[in-house]
UniProtKB/Swiss-Prot annotation:
Protein name: Aminomethyltransferase
Entry EC no(s): 2.1.2.10
Naturally occurring in which organism (per UniProt): Salmonella enteritidis PT4 (strain P125109)
Quaternary structure and partners: The glycine cleavage system is composed of four proteins: P, T, L and H.
Gene label: gcvT
Reaction(s) catalysed by this chain's protein: N(6)-[(R)-S(8)-aminomethyldihydrolipoyl]-L-lysyl-[protein] + (6S)-5,6,7,8-tetrahydrofolate = N(6)-[(R)-dihydrolipoyl]-L-lysyl-[protein] + (6R)-5,10-methylene-5,6,7,8-tetrahydrofolate + NH4(+)
């Protein structure tokens, strides 16, 4: 039987259509996925992301452990509350998960990992933490609400205490702070400003209702997917998985190659891939009628005249742009155009960087 978050009842009261998402009953939409998408791009929307897993790590060697566990380097984290995005890789350089790490003190770091990968993540972390004597606490006592959009921070702040408002005032992106009952982070999955707010489970329903009263629109998984795709953000299981390198998933920027003597899981495999060459993740835009969908083939002719083929990893109609967009994993050497086979039609597409919308504006 699928699990329910502490906000399940609130979703049904808001008229949600509930679906099973990796073993969790989650809202797909509350009537109109399109309206929810536009609310986040133009005003403020909120998502229940309590199905994600918060993991607290304590111990004097926590930083040392994370420098080995992750491809990005937590040595970069020197300011309290600063966050870092990283892949957690296997020995062959495949992505076990992508996650966010927060630094609080030398013996306290926090991870936020995906729901679909929860069990294997916890198993992997526990297995590798043992030699470092790390105390691992899974925070199932916390709910997580993402409030996103150009007016999201202002509307969310109406629920904060004076102390909380003061703590987040002017806080830069990718920081988090614990004030009272709330852990407030300037992170998100939409390409808009906003907060991801963790709170005790018993406080979540009241907080959700207060956000509704403050004019924040409840949004479901459907809008979350179109928003993240417009923003060029990866979805685990589509853009990357245990058989796909971060180098082939537009995550090269998350690999800290320096210092050269830092050993991290997957480093040797990545160095070989970097030397040999690898696939790349690109954006595709199709302004003609039709929708680019996952797993459609992408064909092009390289500079040497060879026929090459890749695959769409995520595709949709973009509500913000009014045409179809996609992320595709393709062999290196793709030019500015390609062909996508949609049923029995060969459709021309423009090849772009893998990002389409930032802060409500087109960038593709």
């Amino acid at each position: 039987m699928a699990q329910q978050t502490p906000l399940y009842e609130q979703h049904t009261l808001c008229g949600a259509r509930m679906v099973d998402f990796h073993g969790w009953m989650m809202p797909l939409h509350y009537g109109s996925q399109l309206d929810e998408h536009h609310a986040v791009r133009t005003d403020a929307g909120m998502f229940d992301v309590s199905h994600m897993t918060i993991v607290d790590l304590h111990g004097s060697r926590t930083r040392e452990f994370l420098r080995y566990l992750l491809a990005n380097d937590v040595a970069k984290l020197t300011k309290t509350g600063k966050a870092l995005y990283s892949g957690m890789l296997n020995a062959s350089g495949g992505v076990i998960d992508d996650l966010i790490i927060y630094y609080f003190t030398e013996d306290f770091f926090r991870l936020v990992v995906n729901s679909a990968t929860r069990e294997k993540d916890l198993s992997w972390i526990t297995q590798h933490a043992e030699p470092y004597a790390i105390d691992i606490t899974v925070r199932d006592d916390l709910s997580l609400i993402a409030v996103q959009g150009p007016n999201a921070q202002e509307k969310a702040a109406t629920l904060f205490t004076d102390e909380q408002r003061h703590a987040v005032e002017g806080m830069k992106p990718f920081f988090g702070v614990q004030v009272g009952d709330l852990f407030i982070a300037t992170t998100g999955y939409t390409g808009e400003a906003g907060y991801e707010i963790a709170m005790p489970n018993e406080k979540a329903a009241d907080f959700w209702r207060a956000l509704v009263e403050a004019g924040v629109k409840p949004c479901g998984l459907g809008a979350r997917d179109t928003l993240r795709l417009e923003a060029g953000m990866n979805l685990y299981g589509q853009e990357m998985d245990e058989g796909i390198s971060p180098l082939a998933a537009n995550m090269g920027w998350t690999i800290a190659w320096e210092p050269a003597d830092r050993d991290f899981i997957g480093r040797e495999a990545l160095e070989m891939q970097r030397e040999k060459g690898h696939e790349q993740l690109v954006g595709l835009v199709m302004t003609e009628k039709g929708v680019l969908r996952n797993e459609l083939p992408v064909r092009f002719t390289d500079a040497q005249g060879n026929q090459q083929e890749g695959i769409i990893t995520s595709g949709t109609f973009s509500p913000t742009l009014g045409y179809s967009i996609a992320l595709a994993r393709v062999p290196a050497g793709i030019g500015e155009t390609a062909i996508v086979q949609i049923r029995n039609r060969e459709m021309p597409v423009k090849v772009t960087k893998p990002v389409f919308v930032r802060n409500g504006k087109a960038v593709a």
